[in-house]
Amino acid sequence: METDYDIIVAGAGIAGMIAASSASIYSKQNLKILVVDRNTQPEAGKKTINGWVCGDAVGKNSVDYMTERIGITWNKPEIEHPVKGVVAYSPDHETPVYFDGEGYILNRRLLPQKQLKDAEKVGIEFRWNVALRGVYT
């Protein structure tokens, strides 16, 4: 097993996959990149242990930025439909937080699989079932 990487990303969720893909794209695939995740490959992007996940909705400006500046594209079916705002609730389900503006609702089952396929195409490697407890340099 390879143990020497330029970049190691902890977590194959939306943010981790964007970080790894961005690094690969900006380096023109010249970096050796590893993504580790506690889940199995079919469970990539699975909700966190406590059941909460951020990322079911995303702003249009974020998707536009990824498309135009990084080269990451999401379309249907990963993007289910556009929205003109969302309401998020605090963990106790009592306090609403309103977000106005154009955005999209994401398909959290299909998006991680698309991100994996795109990442593998540019040479990003993965290790699954890894419980990361610390980082040593």
Give the positions of each predicted feature.
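N-terminal FAD cofactor-binding segment of flavoenzymes
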Residues: S22, Y26, R38-V86
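Flexible, glycine-rich phosphate/dinucleotide-binding loops
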Residues: G16, P42, T95
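Predominantly flavin-linked oxidoreductase catalytic cores and closely associated redox partners
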Residues: A12, S22-Q29, Q41-A44, D118-T137
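A generic secondary-structure micro-motif detector
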Residues: V9, W52, Y104-I105
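N-terminal Rossmann-like FAD-binding beta1-loop-alpha1 element of flavoenzymes
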Residues: E2-V35
